[in-house]
């Protein structure tokens, strides 16, 4: 009993001493100044993507569209308003995936500081694009080809494969014209066609509008494009694919860019078993470039991600369709990344990266001075921008010769 009293006395004395020391000395935590709107914005706004400076967009865009959406994502918005807009089931699904925070990520006072920082430091109007340099292509003669048979206004695919001209519209009708015999036929598919490679046809699912529903599908046709079989369905708004052996079984697999909406992914469908493997889980997967980068005989690939954290990544294959991602170029969320390709433009034996960034259909619809075509060179394993040509709403870049 006596020992117990001694222990209690010692413990009490220890607590009193610790309390005295805490009150006597100024610890950094107790004297830390309140964070500014700029500091808070860098803390929270850079947690999901590259940090956007206020100056990149005009004040009315920040105030009327971007800041309200940021507020909703951080759990400070009116949940009833969000639910009425996207539906209860969709809201719960997105909250579970971390798109919308159910509990506030910061205090209301902190949010007001962020809001004020962006509004006070953003320009009243967007910056104009720089004057374009004159080139011979601007004075060349281009013949416009009109598809007079296409009654539906929204064309989702246009391409020539061997001697067949193929078009598709928003209704999911695939029209095939033999350029030799001039014979035509059409095939009805579940949804609009967005990509065709060899005899494989990719359908986006739904009606082209953004959705979380997984309605996309991949179909394999015969040589005449009359009969087809379903390869895989329940794809999340797929927009591009490659048909290539990724696991060394001599059977081609399907590498699919499931663009999605709030969520999305890059997936591989085994050509033999048709089993699906998820390679990356980010929205906005746009297109691929296949390359054996390290010359080990395994097919690697580059991929462009155009939503949230916009970037171009290199995925190295271990030979069994397991990939390691390395981000080679990172872009802010307002960049508008749209498409990319690799090509040796200056005949030096090394490929340059050509990129179009002009997507302007989300929360910041305004003319942007930084939209256009960019060229990056691989300089000592680092990609550096060496050329920019401003073009509003640029969505795709090509490298070819247009000569008679």
Regions found by a protein language model. Give the residues of each.
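Beta-propeller-forming repeat regions
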Residues: 30-39, 43-404
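Aromatic-capped interface at the extracytoplasmic side
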Residues: 25-28
């Amino acid at each position: 009993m006596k020992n117990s009293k001694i222990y209690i006395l010692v413990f009490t004395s220890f607590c009193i001493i610790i309390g005295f020391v805490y009150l006597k000395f100024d610890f950094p935590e107790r004297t830390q100044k309140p964070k500014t709107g700029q500091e808070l914005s860098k803390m929270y706004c850079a947690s999901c993507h590259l940090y956007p400076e206020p100056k990149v967009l005009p004040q009315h865009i920040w105030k009327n569209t971007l800041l309200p959406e940021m507020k909703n994502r951080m759990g400070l918005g009116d949940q009833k308003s969000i639910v009425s807009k996207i539906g209860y089931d969709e809201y719960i699904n997105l909250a579970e995936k971390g798109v919308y925070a159910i509990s506030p990520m910061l205090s209301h006072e902190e949010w007001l500081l962020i809001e004020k920082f962006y509004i006070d430091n953003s320009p009243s109007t967007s910056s104009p694009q720089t004057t374009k340099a004159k080139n011979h292509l601007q004075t060349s003669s281009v013949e416009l080809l009109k598809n007079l048979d296409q009654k539906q206004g929204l064309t989702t695919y246009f391409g020539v494969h061997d001697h067949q001209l193929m078009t598709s519209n928003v209704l999911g009708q695939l029209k095939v014209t033999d350029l030799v015999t001039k014979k035509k036929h059409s095939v009805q598919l579940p949804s609009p066609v967005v990509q065709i490679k060899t005899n494989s046809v990719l359908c986006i699912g739904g009606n082209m509008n953004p959705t979380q529903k997984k309605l996309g599908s991949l179909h394999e046709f015969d040589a005449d494009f009359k009969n087809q079989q379903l390869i895989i369905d329940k794809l999340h708004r797929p927009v591009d694919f490659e048909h290539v052996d990724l696991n060394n079984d001599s059977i081609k697999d399907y590498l699919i860019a499931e663009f999605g909406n709030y969520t999305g992914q890059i997936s591989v469908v085994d050509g033999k078993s048709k089993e699906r493997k998820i390679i990356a889980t980010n929205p906005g997967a746009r297109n691929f470039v296949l390359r054996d980068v390290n010359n080990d005989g395994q097919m690697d690939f580059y991929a462009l991600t155009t939503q949230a954290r916009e970037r171009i990544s290199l995925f190295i294959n271990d030979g069994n369709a397991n990939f390691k991602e390395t981000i080679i170029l990172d872009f802010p969320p307002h960049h508008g990344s749209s498409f990319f390709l690799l090509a040796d433009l200056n005949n030096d034996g090394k490929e340059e990266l050509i990129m179009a960034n002009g997507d302007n259909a989300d929360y910041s619809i305004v003319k942007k001075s930084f939209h256009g075509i960019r060229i990056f060179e691989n300089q000592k394993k680092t990609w550096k921008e060496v050329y920019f040509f401003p073009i509003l709403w640029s969505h795709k870049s090509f490298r070819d010769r247009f000569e008679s």
